[in-house]
């Protein structure tokens, strides 16, 4: 894992107990409850730390997730749609988060706007199955990716703040 601040944030996210994916019907319902509880706690912790940076919701089955994330850079808010599907082999396989608006704008992204998490995040996820869930995916996957990629894309002029585009 990264620095002490990241460790502290992750230590405050409840770990999950149910090792179940979408194919596991009844157990999947239990896993989804744990996922929601973990996400709610993570969002509450972020709000209390004045670090609120995403919203997520899912379809009724809990297999397709979508929402928004945002990144503040030079006091400007950059907002992006996010989406991902729960793999059939979840939780053994981590979901792949897509930021469709950024598709093709960075080398650290796969076709379809899926962010690259293979080097750092996926080995960590694999060591922590089934304890890690979607809150951990956001905290250790998307969050650090945004922190590295968005300032770089802004500096290179690849993305611009919406207000600057309208002027």
Swiss-Prot record:
Alphabetized Gene3D superfamilies for the sequence: Ubiquitin Conjugating Enzyme
Transcription is among the record's keywords: no
Covalent link Glycyl lysine isopeptide (Lys-Gly) (interchain with G-Cter in UFM1), residues: 122
Impact after mutating residue 30 to A: Does not affect neither UBA5-binding nor thioester formation with UFM1
Assigned GO CC terms: extracellular exosome
CDD domains tied to this protein: UBCc_UFC1 (cd11686)
Description of how the protein assembles with itself and partners: Interacts with UBA5 (via C-terminus). Interacts with UFL1. Interacts with UFM1. Interacts with KIRREL3.
PTM section of the record: Ufmylated at Lys-122. Deufmylated by UFSP1.
Family the entry assigns: Belongs to the ubiquitin-conjugating enzyme family. UFC1 subfamily.
Consequence recorded when altering residue 110 to A: Decreased UFM1 transfer
Biological processes per GO annotation: brain development; protein K69-linked ufmylation; protein ufmylation; regulation of type II interferon production; response to endoplasmic reticulum stress; reticulophagy
InterPro entries: UBQ-conjugating_enzyme/RWD, Ufc1
Catalytic residues as annotated in Swiss-Prot or TrEMBL: 116 (glycyl thioester intermediate)
The UniProt record lists the keyword Ubl conjugation: yes
Effect upon mutating residue 50 to A: Decreased ribosome ufmylation
Keywords carried by this UniProt record: Disease variant, Isopeptide bond, Ubl conjugation, Ubl conjugation pathway
Pfam families: UFC1
Domain text: In absence of UBA5, the active site is solvated by water molecules thereby reducing its nucleophilic activity. A linker region of UBA5 is required to reduce the amount of water molecules in the vicinity of the active site and elevate its nucleophilic activity.
UniProt protein name: Ubiquitin-fold modifier-conjugating enzyme 1
Residue runs in coiled coils: none
């Amino acid at each position: 894992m990264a620095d002490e601040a990241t460790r502290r944030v992750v230590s405050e996210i409840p770990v999950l107990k149910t090792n179940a994916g979408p194919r596991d019907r009844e157990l999947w319902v239990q896993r989804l409850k744990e996922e929601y509880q973990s996400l709610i706690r993570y969002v509450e912790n972020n709000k209390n730390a004045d670090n609120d940076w995403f919203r997520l919701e899912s379809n009724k089955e809990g297999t397709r997730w979508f929402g928004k994330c945002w990144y503040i850079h030079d006091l400007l808010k950059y907002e992006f749609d996010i989406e991902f599907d729960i793999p059939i082999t979840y939780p053994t396989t981590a979901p792949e988060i897509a930021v469709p608006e950024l598709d093709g704008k960075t080398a650290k992204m796969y076709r379809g706007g899926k962010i690259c998490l293979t080097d750092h995040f996926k080995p960590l996820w694999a060591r922590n199955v089934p304890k890690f869930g979607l809150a951990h995916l956001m905290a250790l996957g998307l969050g650090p990716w945004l922190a590295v990629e968005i300032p770089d894309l802004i500096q290179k002029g690849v993305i611009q703040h919406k207000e600057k585009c309208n002027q």
